[in-house]
Structure formats: C-alpha cells, structure tokens
C-alpha cells in the first residue's frame, strides 16, 4: 500500500507528500495528541513550545499543567482537545488511530460512560470520519486497582472501547497489583497494552507482559539492555509502539541516530512509529518517519516495513 510513494517521499524529504500517505498512530494520548495550531486558533494565543529536553514524566506533567491544560479544562476543553486530535490525524494521513481516553473522563459527563461515548462518536464523525478510530481506555498507574475497576466497569456495557493501556509513573505500583483489572479487560476481548520499559529496566518489560498478559507495549525501549528480553518479545510476537521524539525529549535516548528502535528491529521485534503527545513534542507521525530517515536509523524501505506494521 503506497510503498513506492512513501519511499520516494522520504528520499525527496517531501513532508507534504509523506502526510498524504496512509499510516497509523497507535500510541497517542488524546488530550495531548492534537494539532497545536488548531488549539491556538481556538484560544486566540500562542502556546509556548517545549524547546529543552526534560528528564521525567513529572517534569512533562508540570510543563503541560502550566502551558496547556488551563485551556482545555472541563467538557468544552476536553472536546476541543479531541477535535484537535482528529484534525491532526487526518492532516497527517493517519488512517488507523488508537487514541487513549483516560477512564476517568466520563466524570466530565456527570459520570456517564454513555454520554462520553456519544461525544467521541460525534466528534469522530464530524472531524475525521475517514480515520479508522480504535478507542482505547487509559489507566493511570498511580491510581489504586479498586478505584480503576470502579471507573472502568460502567464502560463494559457498550462494547465501544477496543483496548486498554496503563500509563504514568512506571514505578507507582507493581504490575501484579493490577492483575484483576487486566483480567477483567481480557474477559471482554479488549487488547491489552501498557507503558513499560520507558524509564524502567528490561526485566520489568517481561514481567509486565507475563503478569498482565499484554498484547503490545507502549515504548519498551529498555528491552535492548537484555538479549533474553528481546528474544522473549520476538518469540511472543509482542509489538512495541515507539515514539522517537518523545524518547529523545524525555532524555531516554541521547541521540536519535542511536535510538534503540534499530536494535529492536534487528532482533526481529515488531515495532511501530508513533507520536505520544503531539502538543508537547510537536512532531506528527510523518515527521517521526522523516527524522528516522534523516538520522540514518533506517533505510526508506525499512521504514515502509515499519509503516505497514502499524496498518496491519
């Protein structure tokens, strides 16, 4: 699908052409996944850019809390952020979008999962009906399993969300604390994902996959530190949804040209290229592909293999 055009666009460094070619974004936090210019036009002012590298999720959250969240508070702000995310995906040629909606957000609709789902359906149809939107529920790892289950249960009657993801502070609590939550999600046929191996070590990746029975991992880049963990991921066909610019800006890698995605790929692990938080890191998926090409991490042909990984 569009292999020749994609390769030519990379070789010619034609970002507009790249944006026209079908791709996926499987690691996207909805509130932070939007088109920055769209939000700026709505609020009537320019939002500061993150220009310096930071070293922790806490630093990122502080930056977001100061520079962005004040403009997207409440139901109206939430819906504008979702609009911006759909607009960003459409403009970037993303035809498959797995976008993370925090399980708590039904509280913006008086606790109604049904009303939240109605809003998401409406916004999807209005702003990006051509995008295959695969809704994902997000669990903050700092919240107790008991409370997450309480927030999660009302969604189960609607069969709308297709996957779940665990994100936030990797060290907030062990994966074993969340087994019941993930068993519940699995019993409903949801795809199981989690953020792991971004700040944590390689061993934590295998442990989390085994304990929570994960299908995919968000980040997982520290797997390169263990050949046995890489073998485990390859053997079990665990896909890693990687966000290169996010990894660089959060100081998880020193240079893009040495990003571990190369070694993971060479060890037979299925990887995809994604955005994480466009509002913060300012790169769409097209820019991420071009960055990896410019930094000679992959050839254009290899990047097309990775692009197609995400579309399958």
Enumerate the language-model features and the residues they cover.
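Metal-cofactor-binding active-site regions of metalloenzymes
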Residues: 1-190, 199-204, 211-212, 216, ...
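Conserved hydrophobic beta-strand within the GNAT/NAT acetyltransferase core sheet
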Residues: 192-194
